């Protein structure tokens, strides 16, 4: 073996050994990198997974039947105007964290939709430095007053984020099949005809499906609904 070949072989061995952890720097010579501070929140214009809505997006007030259905199901929080989420038109219901909500507005911490930033925030711990902004709300669930089949499809698709209410505005009492299907899928069913008070027919699952796990996408939807709440002038109740 030539001197050059020997040098290359030695270099390869040392590199492999370093990768295998055979050679390590003494404790005194190690340098622990200082963690970077959380990124400042910036309103993102686009996100392929959770697309932002336009700043000039229009909205209509929440229908009385939908608001009454949330009350009949004893859901806490604020019903927001209808919004398209993952291709489904629903009325989101959120429970504001009033203290965080007001703190973020006072600090100018706008809703954040960038998933890489949210992944960074969600994994941050107190020992790394000042905590990034907390979520201003919790997703309670979603209401749909669409035709029963479409309503069930929408709230089932969004089941990883929260519960769901099928709002039946028909004059006739809900059918056996609809009652059975809501009971089977864990959806709430509220009958809200135009000439009678809203009535809870099926009490469904509270919260997301039991297999759901919190991810940066979960936080992304919380941030989007925070943005939608601000856009539609929703406010948390004042203390006292």
Summary of predicted features, one role per range:
Residues 1-102, 111-113, 231-240:
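Nuclease-adjacent, charged terminal/linker segments that flank catalytic cores
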Residues 66, 70, 121, 221, ...:
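Generic structural signal of hydrophobic/aromatic residues within well-ordered alpha-helices
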Residues 87-123, 128-130, 135-148, 157:
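Conserved catalytic cores of phosphodiester-cleaving nucleases, focusing on short active-site segments
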Residues 147-155, 169, 174-177:
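Active-site-adjacent loop/helix micro-motif of nuclease/hydrolase catalytic cores
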